[in-house]
């Protein structure tokens, strides 16, 4: 299932800020970047949504898999997982999260991948 609009991270300025200044947490199959939310970087139509809520994005390059079907399956799996985890996150969770998958992610089963995602979210302090 796809992330709701209020939880989606959009805009090149947001991604640039996360890439440059975000705190990085490394796993074997993914890198999690976290930064405190800055609603001023959001485009005007998206600012009216809950600007201080957690917003997420998942980046999967063609190095992970040349097949779009596999990349989209991984993206949907992670979106669904992030949605279930961050919807129950504390109200003070006003961070932006970017998950970048490494090429080894396509060879890993679903449950270890999601467990690693949870571990990185705990390291980042987004889950208790």
From Swiss-Prot:
Give the organism, scientific name: Prochlorococcus marinus (strain MIT 9303)
What is the name of the gene encoding this protein? rnpA
Q: What is this protein called?
A: Ribonuclease P protein component
- A UniProt-annotated Pfam family: Ribonuclease_P
- What is the annotated role of this protein in its UniProt record? RNaseP catalyzes the removal of the 5'-leader sequence from pre-tRNA to produce the mature 5'-terminus. It can also cleave other RNA substrates such as 4.5S RNA. The protein component plays an auxiliary but essential role in vivo by binding to the 5'-leader sequence and broadening the substrate specificity of the ribozyme.
Q: Which HAMAP family match?
A: RNase_P
Q: Which GO terms describe its biological process?
A: tRNA 5'-leader removal
Question: Care to name a GO molecular-function term for this sequence?
Answer: tRNA binding
InterPro entries membership = Ribosomal_Su5_D2-typ_SF (IPR020568), Ribsml_uS5_D2-typ_fold_subgr (IPR014721), RNase_P (IPR000100)
Keywords per UniProt: Endonuclease, Hydrolase, Nuclease, RNA-binding, tRNA processing
How does this chain assemble? Consists of a catalytic RNA component (M1 or rnpB) and a protein subunit.
Mind telling me which GO cellular component terms the entry cites? Answer: ribonuclease P complex
User: Which reaction(s) does its UniProt entry say it catalyses?
Assistant: Endonucleolytic cleavage of RNA, removing 5'-extranucleotides from tRNA precursor
Membership in a protein family: Belongs to the RnpA family.
Please name the top-level EC class of this enzyme: hydrolase
EC numbers listed for it are: 3.1.26.5
According to the entry, what is the taxonomic lineage of the organism? Bacteria, Bacillati, Cyanobacteriota, Cyanophyceae, Synechococcales
